Structures are given as C-alpha cells and as structure tokens.
Amino acid sequence: MYDPARVRSVGEEILDFRHKAVPAALQGLRLVDFGGLGLGRLQTPLLTLDRDALDVNARLLADWCEERGILLAPHGKTTMSPELWARQMDLGAWGITLANAAQLRVARHFGFTRLMLANSLTDPQAIRWAAEQASTARGSSPGWIRRTPSPCSTSN
C-alpha cells in the first residue's frame, strides 16, 4: 500500500532554506538529527507533535473504526506527512484522502496506492496523470479512482 523505504528516506532529507523553522546555523542537518535538538533552537511559530500522544490517538481511532467495521481514509492533506500516513495505514486505514493533484503526486511518490480524492480534478493534464496512475498503481484495484455522485449534480 506504500513504499516503506521511500517513507523512511524522509528522515535523510537535508534541511535548507526551504524548511521554514530551520535557522540558518542548522541548515545542512538531516531531518532525523534535527528533531533531537530541542525546541529552544527552533524558530517560531512552529507546530510540534508528541509522538506518544499521537500513537495513542492513532491506535484509539483505528480500534474504534475496526470495532464498527468502518473503513478509514484519513485526510492526508492536513499533515502532508508520508510518515504519519504510513503509521495510519499500518494501523489499518483503508487509504489516504487528499484534495488536489499536487497532493496525489506526493502520495504516489511515496508509493501509496489507496487514495481518495476529496475534490474534482479539472486540469486536463492532472486528469491524464491520474488516469495513468490508476492503470499502473501497484496493489491497486481498477477502482483506484472512483466516480462518486455529486450532491450538486442532477445526473448520477
């Protein structure tokens, strides 16, 4: 459902000017080394996550969904974190929900195959790309992209 090696590779990314909270003095570090520096070395505003609390919440939601027979496709667009998506998939999520073609490309780069689009693609190039992905996504079903009725549509 995703490529574990690609997801792990995120931690090896070298931090630079593209990373908002990284002071110039810390650029050049790998992301995996950056996390242990402590909050005092980071620029604000900055959002941090408590790994233990995140794990507890992810497990609670996964268990709740499983007990009720619910297939969960959490919003990946909120975090844009392949590592978090992988954790959710490992805990039983059916797939990941995204909002646009750029977000779909990120997910496909990391090998995610069960993706739900919570929007309509209107750009012809994005539609062609998505159709190509649907035909080649490893581990996907022919329904990788599904048409769902729109509440605004007169014909379903």
Residue ranges and their predicted role:
Residues 36-43, 87-88, 112:
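Gly-rich Lys/Arg/Thr-decorated short loops/hinges at beta-loop-alpha junctions or inter-strand turns
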